[in-house]
UniProtKB/Swiss-Prot annotation:
<keyword id="KW-0132">Cell division</keyword>
<protein>
    <recommendedName>
        <fullName>UDP-N-acetylmuramoylalanine--D-glutamate ligase</fullName>
        <ecNumber>6.3.2.9</ecNumber>
    </recommendedName>
</protein>
<dbReference type="GO" id="GO:0071555">
    <property type="term" value="P:cell wall organization"/>
</dbReference>
<dbReference type="GO" id="GO:0051301">
    <property type="term" value="P:cell division"/>
</dbReference>
<keyword id="KW-0547">Nucleotide-binding</keyword>
<dbReference type="InterPro" id="IPR004101">
    <property type="entry name" value="Mur_ligase_C"/>
</dbReference>
<dbReference type="Pfam" id="PF21799">
    <property type="entry name" value="MurD-like_N"/>
</dbReference>
<keyword id="KW-0961">Cell wall biogenesis/degradation</keyword>
<keyword id="KW-0963">Cytoplasm</keyword>
<keyword id="KW-0436">Ligase</keyword>
<dbReference type="InterPro" id="IPR036565">
    <property type="entry name" value="Mur-like_cat_sf"/>
</dbReference>
<dbReference type="GO" id="GO:0009252">
    <property type="term" value="P:peptidoglycan biosynthetic process"/>
</dbReference>
<dbReference type="GO" id="GO:0005737">
    <property type="term" value="C:cytoplasm"/>
</dbReference>
<keyword id="KW-0573">Peptidoglycan synthesis</keyword>
<dbReference type="GO" id="GO:0005524">
    <property type="term" value="F:ATP binding"/>
</dbReference>
<dbReference type="Pfam" id="PF02875">
    <property type="entry name" value="Mur_ligase_C"/>
</dbReference>
<dbReference type="GO" id="GO:0008360">
    <property type="term" value="P:regulation of cell shape"/>
</dbReference>
């Protein structure tokens, strides 16, 4: 029997190993770590009949004991698709596969909505899944957040969850790169700004990966308010376009937009419902509303069903999540803002003046827009984590006139921010890191959860 090796015991690796085992394939999992978490995961898989080897680095020699039977190696999105070891295995004729492609093969009898973009994809994923579910369509979400695609496939194929009508999948550039055959029924592209350049090298390479998903989608939906997508519209696949503002005379046509009276309009069908049915703040959420409306309409929902779903949406954890108020300011958790552009968009939605907590593991990118929003809205910035010194220098060079504080971690940052909010009579206190979380946290969710816990003693009750 041929063998598939799964690399890594992360969320994707666990799902992939279990799915392959369920399909009757011989599987071995290789994991470089040897800590308590890895040991616990390994014991669980071994009890299920899956072989796990710990302390095995991703090197070509690590595969030697299984070379005679090795047919394929499966990797999750955390491993670069062009890793030298993977390239070496390719040259030897070994298939290199992404976890997302295993899930696609197992679930391509169900229509997919594939949602990608630098920012906005998590909100659109949550919102579309909710709107469809509210209308009685079984449309679970997963992929780049929540349940891994392979784990979702396993639960469906085992009959542990009902077979969905649709799958609403958030797809990162890493997953798209590793899923060249993934072809959703509907593809949605929310935004494109420089991100993950440490991995992809250039903006052009990053854009091409995102574009490939939309090219393979039966229907493509684009955000016409995004500067990069709009500039590249002539080269993009024909599809549907949404714009939050009414199209001007010289603008390319839009399929959905919001008119001057605040009503969502459809090119085919006319007035639908007031945009204010979605309570989430910010111009970017009007774009998200339109992308979801376009997809839901294609799936078969009418205007009333879409409006009811939007109106009942509770929001997305860690994305401008309103935690309540201190005695003087509204508190928002925007831990999902892991780059400058996402952080700038969050700031735009805030009532100023704002005390901002920022920091973590910095990324390559253009900080100009973020710095402009800080200068416009923020009365104080509290920096924490590994990137605090770098961000401090960036902010001071921008001639920012507000207070700048620097500390080691989020706990210290919250104490400073709460004090500054009171002293400066700020209207809002916002965690908006503009950085990845991996310097001090497992992921942005853990960072946001910690912020929520740290803020709890300071929140106003009653």
């Amino acid at each position: 029997m041929t063998l598939t090796i799964v690399v890594g015991l992360g969320r994707s690796g666990l799902g992939a190993a279990r799915l392959l085992h369920h399909q009757g394939q011989k599987v071995v999992v290789l994991e470089r770590g040897t800590g308590p978490d890895q040991t616990s995961c390994a014991a669980t898989l071994q009890a299920e009949g899956i072989q796990v080897e710990l302390g095995i680095p991703l090197e070509i020699n690590s595969f030697e004991p299984w070379r005679s039977d090795l047919d394929a190696v499966v990797v999750g999105p955390g491993i670069p698709w062009d890793h030298p070891t993977l390239n070496g295995l390719r040259q030897e004729g070994v298939q290199i596969r992404g976890e997302i492609e295993l899930a696609w093969e197992a679930l391509n009898d169900i229509p997919w909505v594939g949602i990608t973009g630098t920012n906005g994809k998590t909100t659109v994923t949550h919102l579309l899944s909710h709107v469809l579910g509210h209308a009685g369509i079984v449309a679970p979400m997963g992929g780049n957040m929540g349940v891994s695609a392979a784990d979702m496939a396993l639960k469906i194929r085992r009959g542990e969850t009902p077979k969905p009508d649709w799958l609403v999948m958030e797809l990162s550039s890493y997953q798209i790169e590793a899923g060249p055959n993934l072809a959703p029924s509907i593809g949605i592209w929310t935004t494109l700004t420089p991100d993950h350049l440490e991995r992809h090298g250039t903006l052009e390479a990053y854009r091409a990966i995102k574009h490939s998903l939309l090219q393979r989608s039966s229907l493509a939906i684009f955000n016409g308010d995004d500067a990069d997508l709009s500039a590249h519209r002539p080269s993009l696949k024909r599809g549907m376009w949404v714009k939050a503002a009414p199209p001007c005379h010289d603008d390319p046509p839009a399929d959905f937009w919001i008119d001057d009276a605040g009503t969502v309009q459809a090119r085919e069908g006319g007035a639908m419902f007031p945009a204010k049915v979605l309570a989430m703040p910010g111009a970017h959420n009007r774009q998200n509303l339109l992308l979801v409306t376009a997809a839901a309409a294609q799936i078969g929902l009418n205007a009333e069903q879409i409006a009811q779903g939007l109106e009942s949406f509770p929001g997305v954890p860690h994305r401008l999540e309103n935690l309540g108020s201190t005695s003087s300011a509204d508190v928002f958790n925007d831990s999902k803002a892991t780059n400058y552009d996402a952080a700038a968009v969050g700031l735009q939605a805030m009532a100023g003046p704002v005390v901002v907590l920022a920091g973590g593991q910095t990324k390559r990118g253009n900080a100009t827009g973020w710095l402009a929003e800080l200068k416009s809205k923020a009365c104080a910035v509290v920096l924490f984590g590994a990137g605090a010194e770098e961000l401090d220098a960036l902010i001071r060079q921008s001639n920012y006139q507000g207070q700048v504080h620097r500390c080691t971690d989020l706990s210290a940052a919250v104490a400073i921010a709460v004090r500054a909010t009171s002293e400066l009579q700020a209207s809002s206190l916002l965690l908006s890191p503009a950085c990845a979380s991996f310097d001090q946290y497992q992921d942005f969710e853990a960072r946001g959860d910690h912020f929520r816990d740290l803020m709890q003693p300071h929140m106003h009750v009653g």
